[in-house]
């Protein structure tokens, strides 16, 4: 709690990330209750938060807090697959892609700033399709590549990067190309 108060007093503007190392919305209600309490404490101290989850509907329980603080809240989800069989194999504990997309749309409609993390890219065509499926209710895209997998060598990352930039630019979307993909 002391750290939170110090951050609040310092005028910190960068968002506190929930979470890039473990999902804040898991299948355990105790964790989800802790996540909600953490959000409440951070918002009570006027600290900006950015949520990244694969939790889908599980995350919607906190949309009331986020929508009450639209200037302090960002909600994002990781999207990798349009193919549900691949999604279930690679992301077995994550919510289905369609569910995550519905949660994104709901957040956006509540006035919450939304973003998508498109990574790792297993199939460039699926990633491009995900942009086309979500662009009407996503404010920002972060795009990375597949790393630490032999499959990465079979993808022409330069072509993919250029296609992503073209599509997002044509749609008028803000985006960030991660360093691992920028070099192509």
What spans do the regions from the language model cover?
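Conserved AdoMet/S-adenosylmethionine-binding subsite of the radical SAM
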Residues: 2-168
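C-terminal accessory regions of radical SAM enzymes
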Residues: 166-184
């Amino acid at each position: 709690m002391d750290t939170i108060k110090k951050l609040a007093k310092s005028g910190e503007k960068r968002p506190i990330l929930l979470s890039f190392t473990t999902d804040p919305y898991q299948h355990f209600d105790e964790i989800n209750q802790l996540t909600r309490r953490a959000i409440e404490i951070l918002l009570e101290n006027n600290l900006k938060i950015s949520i990244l989850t694969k939790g889908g509907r599980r995350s919607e329980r906190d949309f009331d807090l986020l929508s009450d603080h639209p200037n302090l809240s960002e909600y994002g989800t990781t999207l990798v697959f349009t193919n549900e069989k691949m999604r279930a194999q690679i992301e077995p504990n994550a919510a289905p892609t369609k569910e995550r997309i519905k949660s994104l749309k709901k957040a956006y409609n509540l006035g919450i700033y939304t973003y998508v993390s498109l990574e790792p890219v297993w199939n460039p065509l699926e990633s491009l399709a995900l942009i086309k499926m979500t662009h009407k209710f996503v404010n920002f895209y972060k795009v990375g590549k597949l790393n630490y997998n032999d499959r990465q060598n079979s993808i022409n990352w330069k072509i993919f990067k250029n296609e992503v930039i073209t599509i997002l630019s044509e749609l008028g979307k803000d985006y960030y190309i991660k360093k691992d993909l920028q070099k192509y």
